[in-house]
C-alpha cells in the first residue's frame, strides 16, 4: 500500500495540455521520453490522450548524451510545443542544448523538471521552459524564510539545492509529507504500523503546498 501527497501524472499532463492550448494555441506537439521509462512514457501517453491535435513521439535510449537529432526533428516538423517529461540529468542536457541552438519552441516539462539544476541550465538564454509544479516560492513566506535561512547556513544543503536558495517544490512536498505522517501518528496514538496505516485515510492536513486528503487508494485529494 502507499499514500502519496503529490498530484497524479494524468492530472499533470492534462494541465500541461490545457496550458499549451491556451497560451500557444498549440495544434502540433513533439513528445520526447526515455525508452522503457514508465514515468516518461506514461506522461506522454496521458498527454497524447488529452491533446486533440497532432502528436509526434520519439524515445531515446538510456544514457543518451546528444539530443541534437531529436531537437532538430522538432524544428523540422514545425511543432508548436515540445513535451519532455524526463529525468533531471536528461532535462539539463536538453535545456542546455536548446539554449545553445537558440531554440524558440516552448519546452514543457513535468514535475521532474521543476529542479533548480534544470532551471539554472536555462538561465541567461531565451529558452522558453514551462514546468508543472507542486509549490511556487511565495506560497508560504514563513516556510520560504525558514528554508532559505537553513540553506544559507549549510553549504552542503545549498549545493544539493542547485547552488542557490530558490525553494524547490520537492522541499515543500517533503515538508508536508512529514507533517501528514505526524498527523497520522497522532491520530493512531501509536507508532504501530498497522495503526498508522488505518489512520492515514482519514488524515486531512493543510500544508505549505495546499490542502491534502486521501482517497480510498491512497492517492491525494487536492484542492489547489
Task: Identify the function of each model-found stretch.
Residues 7-11, 35-39, 60-65, 87-92, ...:
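Solvent-exposed loop/turn segments at secondary-structure junctions
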Residues 18-25, 48-52, 72-79, 96-103, ...:
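Sec-exported extracytoplasmic/periplasmic mature domains
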Residues 53, 95-175:
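Extracellular/periplasmic periplasmic-binding protein-like sensory domains
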Residues 1-7, 33-36, 130-137, 163-169, ...:
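Second-shell loop/turn segments in exported
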Residues 28-33, 78-88, 94, 105-110, ...:
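Periplasmic-binding protein-like
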Residues 2-62, 81:
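An alpha-beta-alpha
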Residues 12-15, 59-76, 141-143:
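Structural motif
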Residues 155-172, 182-224:
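Segments of small-molecule ligand-sensing domains
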